Amino acid sequence: MGYTNSPLVVYTKLSPNHSGQRTHSIDRITPHCVVGQLSAESICGCFTSTSRQASCNYGIGTDGRVSLCVEEKNRSWCSSSNANDQRAVTIECASDMNEPYAMNSAVYDSLVKLCIDICKRNGKKNLLWLGDKNKTLNYAPAADEMVLTVHRWFANKSCPGNWLYARLGDLAARVTAALGGSSSSGMQASSLKNLSEAEAVAKIGPLFTANQKTTGILACVSMAQFI
């Protein structure tokens, strides 16, 4: 499958800071806090100089507008990890300057929409948040799965900040619900037999959370009935 860029992009300023075409297919998304209430244009501007030795695939400005800094086909320099960035779409999001590096609703809503778009174009129906570094980095996603990772797992940083970190489960649930992976997947309980408890909850939890919003049935009740 060929690589494409998001149609949500309204501004493009390509950075020279990248490693060329990826050596791994896209199966991760890594959202970051840019540490500043920057515009979409300013985020790209941070990465135009080769002396910076950093970049990202997309930026989300403080008003929610999306910019393209490194084409999706190319590996950006964003997460302090070659292995992660080879397979992840990296997104720098406008945020406050200090912990918890909060993001406004326009930025968060755009992040949800951008993740939905990235998953759709890359053939994914489920976005997973496992919430644990070792489990995530050792997890082999199914062909229709995308996994969230964070910069703090690869460097001594707070990124993406505690504000977004606490909402990554919600991000995964919203994206998975929009992708419709739950009702059409035909998932059976037996498909979870080789997963740890944390992996099983991460895989099916967002599906039942999304179902709760439409049916009113508590997610824990639906999950218990499923298992």
What are these regions (language model features)?
Residues 1-85:
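N-terminal catalytic cores of peptidoglycan-degrading enzymes
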Residues 2-11, 18-23, 97-191, 195:
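Basic/polar, cationic surfaces and motifs that engage anionic cell-wall
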Residues 24, 84, 100-108, 197, ...:
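Solvent-exposed, acidic/flexible segments
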Residues 28, 88, 147:
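Hydrophobic "anchor" residues on beta-strands that sit immediately upstream
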Residues 35, 72, 82-100, 116-120, ...:
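Cell-envelope and extracellular/periplasmic
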Residues 184-227:
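N-terminal capping segments
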